[in-house]
Amino acid sequence: MPAVSRASPLPQGRRVPVLYPGLLTAHHVPPPTLAGIRGEKEQQLNEHTLSMRLERVAAHMPAGARLADIGSDHGYLPVALLRRGAIAAAVAGEVALTPFQAARRTVRENGFEQHISVRHASGLAAIRPQDEITAISICGMGGETIRDILASGKAHLSGRERLILQPNGGEQPLRQWLMENHYHILCEELLRENRFYYEIIVAERIGPVSYTAEQLYFGPFQMQARSPLFLGKWQRMLGEKRKVLSNLALARQAVPEARVEEIARQVRWISELLA
């Protein structure tokens, strides 16, 4: 497959403004009223129309980045970014054969074969040193899966890339890995799409960093900003955790004490957060 091109000019295309601009840091909070958006599988999505989640991921892409989109599916994100002139080149990595073939088709139909290399590979193995990647996006997977991809593919990381991660749950173990590997969380977003809550975590490897257990659980910027959407999410989670705790107490079989203590601790943290 072709390597990512550095020399040939980009095909001319219309620049499209990024939708839903803004990011969640300690100083800027996006509008919380994001409910009612239909999910990716319910839309006719393509390289022209991204889901809200992918639009928000796109908003955090450094200008002129050389992107590795891991688990690229149909390749919509890198193709859309290249059409907008937002990135210089990309690698679209996909381990599953059918999405890999779909991504190749999307790239070919847009005439971007010289600028987007579609590779059938597992995780970060899609990245080669000559790609000189400056940004990595991993979206739509569980946080633990994203963590495992990063951990198993550390040899492919230069440490200079921006990580733009959109986990479907499991944010705590992902943040734990980022902290242990000296990645600072630069900003976070929370959005609601198709009735579900999703987070976006943007991180860069800067040096040692320390987060409290609560910050790893809730997100350091999320805790500080306390947006209505964030508080609504954890109000709902509190009810679910309390129900789990009650069910564990009524369980016929013995439940590991560590499991009960973990849920009880989470209930306490959420209660204190909402107090």
Q: Where would I find each of the regions flagged by the language model?
A:
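Short alpha-helix immediately C-terminal to the canonical SAM-binding loop
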Residues: L97-Q101
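Short SAM/SAH-binding signature in class I
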Residues: E132-G140
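Conserved SAM-binding loop of SAM-dependent methyltransferases across substrates and taxa
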Residues: H74-I87
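Conserved class I S-adenosyl-L-methionine
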Residues: G64-D73
